[in-house]
Design a protein with these regions (language model features):
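Beta-rich carbohydrate-recognition and catalytic domains
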Residues: 1-124, 128-181
Length: 181
């Protein structure tokens, strides 16, 4: 069993989020592993939530949110801070102990979804392999028109080249604003 978690090794605040990793044979006794992912690429200042699955070849396939935030105080309100924030979806592969980020990351960005959504709030991928053998991912995103969340569905033949399929659920305002994992 593998347990991944998010943490910031430098602070108690959201910032340079990393993925930690524990494994267990029985769910009672756990072994700590070194950090699986750190924000060490140009497109990320934090590695946020995602999904880990066993791929068709038996390796681990992980899709995670790469957060790039250059606001002075790590604020999500960048209009007043004159900063830059963008969230994209990335993949990594591994064998259970070592993981390698895909060199072509990010695999889903603003290029793959409709213009009515904002790249500042586009996160929390849920990844699976369908019965048809294709990869599917559901993410949440914020609409520009009303700042409410929506669930977006994407598909891929190879987990690298993704296409937007549909908005499968839209927030009507009765469930808060932007949705989270």
């Amino acid at each position: 069993y593998h347990l991944f978690y998010q943490y910031n090794p430098y602070s108690t605040r959201w910032d340079a989020m990393h993925w930690g990793h524990w494994t267990s044979e029985d769910l009672l006794h756990w072994d700590y592993h070194e950090t699986s992912f750190a924000p060490d690429e140009d497109y990320e200042t934090g590695v946020f939530s995602g999904t880990a699955i066993t791929d068709k070849d038996g390796s681990h396939l992980i899709m995670y949110t790469a957060d790039y935030n250059k606001a002075p105080d790590y604020s999500t309100d960048l209009s007043e801070k004159n900063g830059v924030r963008r969230e994209t979806q990335c993949i990594a592969r591994g064998d259970g102990s070592q993981y390698q980020k895909y060199e072509g990351n990010p695999v889903i960005s603003e290029k793959e979804f409709p213009e009515e959504f904002t790249i500042e709030d586009f996160r929390d991928p849920k990844l699976w392999i369908g019965k048809d053998g294709k990869y599917y991912a559901v993410t949440v995103a914020r609409k520009k028109s009303d700042n409410l969340g929506a669930a977006l569905l994407f598909s891929s033949e190879n987990a690298v080249e993704w296409q937007y399929l549909d908005m499968i659920r839209e927030n009507d305002g009765n469930f808060g604003g932007m949705w989270e994992c």
